[in-house]
């Protein structure tokens, strides 16, 4: 499974954050993870590789959830007066994923995090989502470079 596909699975998992109470998230994550491997993209994967992917997704999902308040504050700060309530859920999810990768995941270069989140916004967001996501993330990256 490609890194891009793994990131897309993480995006879909993170999308759950706004639709389920915290008490149900563990069950929702388990259900989602158990379905990985049942699609055509994973048909060629070994069970060992699928287990590694599932574990990585689970770890990253909970890492994002742990930093969610900080990440959401950063989104509101950088989205020029737009509250999270006014933003499209797909845009919020793409931003959460990228900001997590930029600020907390040393294995992902900032440019890759930005580009991949813009691509996710193209697929799952509105026509205006890619430009919005790129603008917010550009501001986040610039701030990080200044620190």
Residue ranges and their predicted role:
Residues 1-130, 134-147:
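N-terminal interaction/assembly modules
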């Amino acid at each position: 499974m490609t890194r891009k596909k793994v990131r897309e699975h993480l995006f879909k998992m993170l999308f759950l954050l706004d639709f389920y109470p915290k008490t149900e998230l563990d069950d929702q994550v388990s259900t989602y993870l158990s379905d990985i491997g049942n699609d055509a993209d994973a048909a060629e994967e070994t069970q060992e590789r699928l287990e590694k992917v599932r574990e990585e997704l689970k770890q990253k999902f909970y890492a994002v959830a742990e930093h969610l308040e900080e990440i959401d504050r950063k989104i509101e700060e950088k989205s020029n007066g737009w509250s999270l309530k006014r933003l499209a859920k797909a845009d919020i999810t793409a931003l959460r994923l990228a900001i997590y990768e930029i600020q907390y995941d040393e294995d992902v270069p900032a440019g890759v995090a930005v580009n991949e989140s813009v691509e996710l916004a193209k697929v799952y967001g509105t026509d205006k989502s890619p430009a919005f996501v790129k603008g917010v993330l550009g501001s986040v990256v610039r701030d990080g470079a200044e620190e």
